[in-house]
């Protein structure tokens, strides 16, 4: 189905080839500079005939709206911490929508809005030039054209893709055979990848959070809270017990612009539609990275759908509290977690897709799910309702039709706090997943941390009507179903899913799960002598630099599932007017003829442009 959008791609390529480069600094109308920060002073209206440079951290504030039309490309400079830059003392480009700002980013299929890197190509090479100091963007980009960018769109028409950008390698990992496959001997944790090439997109709202200023069961005053026996003083700019300052920013200078959270669940930060966020995740400091898309206290008045995060150095999408509802979300080939939830997130989600790398160094949890950063030792969980108690917002997101695919046997070898599972449940998390497909984690399917058991046993964690397969080496045994996390290695909570609730403290929370049926059709798995070491693994990328296909790897079709899944009538009915009734499991319509309709990822994602599928 790629060819159906080729004319749109040609138009997008032509526009991009003729685009000018515009830097969003203090010389741009409606933007001021204070120290190293950029702030809006009026509404910003971009045009798709230019490509825009984020020269640092740009804050949308002062009740301004940042308007981005379809087909626009926005590029962040690589910061000094990026492996693709030189110099010191400057941060990468990021766009931050503060609580008093709005974003209006409405792309369309065939002309998405793309956030990516402003890294320039080395002279005479297609690789990024790592010797450039980007601290003076006006000088760096003087005399440059869009064809000088590392990921220029000028080759789009030649490749015949339906996306506005060309196929790009997500990694510079070496290969050790003629097909470009990667083995353990060819990789290590120091190998550079096409990540950390700019910052990311951050949206901050005024919806409730459970930021964690809690000592036992008491909300702590004066911006101080106790966790794990330690008293933590917070920045003085926060004046509410459930306000926080978002990670990934230089906090002392940013001040209140970085705050999120508040009392308004219906708060609106604007609109994101058909937006692809690529190659970001700059490190500001140890444990202070920027996610591809960060949403702090974002309310359900915000519209977020058709959003992709591709090849980010940190998490793909992270929710810090808030109530925002999302659908048609894709996280592909990111280094850390795919969907991370923290601090009392209560939004709804549908059609979420995760596709992790099989390069052995990328991809942590598909879902790292935390409740709140609080000390629960004195909270009487059995007396707390499923939503909140005494002002404490407890997490309870509800997700329908997710497809999460880990890296399989060739997933991440660099373990994070134990094992890399499809899910980690901790910090008093509660929430629900229905009608989904979860497969191919390198380690166990679910790890329940020592501080995740209480709400699990209360029935506040729900997994119903889902398919699970290929998680850990033995794939389908109870012993391999759960990974270990934290000091408690004997609690077998995750077996409740494997046993469909039999013997569980809350059996109804884990009914109608299937753990012995491979959800994917044989065409989606590798087999044959040409690449026997990968037999049984999910097919990954089939695009290589020469423009040919890998016959042995083929392409993965996320709508192509086994007959057992396609014919399964056990579908849990939707529970909210937000959800779209869907008579199938997973993120893609498996009931329809897969050859006669597009995947919802086609025509705007890197997942599509890189030929991950054969469509």
Predicted regions and their residues:
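Catalytic metal-binding/acid-base residues of hydrolase active sites
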Residues: 73
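Gram-negative bacterial Sec-dependent N-terminal signal peptides
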Residues: 1-19
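Extracellular beta-rich repeat passengers
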Residues: 20-61, 66, 77-100, 112-314, ...
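Conserved H-D interstitial segment of serine endopeptidase catalytic domains
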Residues: 106
């Amino acid at each position: 189905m790629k060819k159906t959008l080729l004319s749109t791609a040609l138009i997008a390529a032509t526009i991009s080839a003729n685009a000018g480069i515009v830097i969003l600094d203090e010389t741009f109308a409606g933007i001021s500079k204070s120290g190293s920060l950029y702030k809006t002073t009026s509404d910003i209206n971009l045009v798709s005939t230019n490509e825009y440079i984020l020269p640092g951290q740009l804050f949308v504030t002062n009740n301004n709206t940042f308007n981005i039309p379809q087909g626009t490309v926005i590029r962040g400079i690589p910061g000094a911490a990026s492996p693709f830059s030189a110099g010191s003392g400057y941060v990468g480009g990021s766009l931050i929508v503060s609580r008093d700002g709005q974003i209006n980013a409405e792309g369309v299929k065939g002309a998405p809005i793309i956030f990516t890197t402003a890294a320039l190509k080395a002279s005479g090479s297609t690789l990024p030039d790592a010797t450039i100091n980007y601290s003076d963007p006006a000088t760096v980009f003087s005399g440059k054209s869009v064809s000088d960018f590392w990921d220029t769109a000028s080759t789009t028409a030649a490749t015949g893709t339906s996306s506005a950008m060309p196929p790009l390698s997500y990694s510079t990992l070496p290969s050790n055979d003629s097909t470009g496959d990667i083995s353990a001997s060819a990789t290590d944790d120091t190998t550079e990848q096409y990540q950390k090439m700019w910052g990311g997109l951050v949206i901050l709202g005024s919806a409730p959070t459970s930021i964690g200023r809690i000592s036992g069961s008491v909300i702590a005053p004066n911006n101080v809270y106790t966790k794990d026996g330690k008293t933590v003083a917070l920045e003085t700019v926060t004046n509410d017990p459930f306000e926080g300052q978002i990670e990934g920013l230089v906090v002392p200078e940013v001040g209140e612009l970085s705050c999120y959270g508040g009392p308004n669940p219906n708060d609106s930060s604007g609109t994101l539609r058909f937006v692809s966020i690529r190659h970001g995740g700059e490190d500001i400091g140890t444990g202070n990275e920027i996610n591809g898309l960060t949403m702090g206290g974002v309310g359900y008045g915000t519209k977020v759908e058709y959003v992709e995060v591709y090849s980010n150095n940190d998490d793909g999408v992270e929710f810090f509290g808030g109530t925002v509802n999302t659908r048609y979300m894709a996280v592909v080939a990111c280094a850390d977690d795919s969907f991370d939830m923290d601090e009392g997130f209560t939004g709804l989600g549908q059609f979420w897709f995760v596709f992790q790398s099989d390069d052995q160094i990328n991809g942590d949890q598909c879902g790292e799910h935390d409740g709140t950063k609080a000390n629960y030792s004195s909270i009487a969980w059995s007396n707390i309702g499923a939503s909140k108690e005494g002002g404490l917002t407890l997490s309870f997101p509800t997700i329908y039709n997710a497809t999460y695919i880990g890296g399989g046997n060739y997933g991440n070898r660099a373990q994070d706090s134990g094992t890399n599972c499809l899910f980690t449940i901790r910090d008093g998390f509660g929430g629900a997943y229905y009608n989904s497909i979860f497969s191919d984690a390198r380690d166990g399917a679910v790890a329940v941390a020592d501080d995740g058991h209480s709400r699990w046993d209360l029935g506040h964690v729900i997994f119903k009507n889902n398919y699970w397969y290929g998680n850990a080496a033995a794939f389908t045994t109870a012993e391999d179903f759960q990974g270990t996390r934290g000091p408690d290695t004997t609690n077998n909570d995750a077996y409740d899913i494997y046993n469909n609730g039999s013997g569980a403290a809350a059996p109804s929370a884990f009914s109608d799960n299937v753990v012995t049926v491979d959800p994917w059709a044989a065409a989606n798995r590798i087999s044959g002598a040409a690449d026997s070491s990968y037999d049984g693994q999910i097919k990954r990328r089939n695009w290589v630099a020469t423009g040919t296909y890998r016959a042995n790897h083929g392409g993965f079709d996320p709508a192509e599932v086994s007959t057992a899944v396609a014919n399964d009538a056990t579908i849990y009915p939707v529970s909210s007017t937000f959800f779209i009734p869907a008579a199938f499991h997973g993120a893609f319509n498996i009931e329809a003829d897969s050859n006669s309709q597009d995947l919802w990822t086609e025509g705007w994602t890197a997942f599509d442009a890189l030929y991950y599928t054969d469509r």
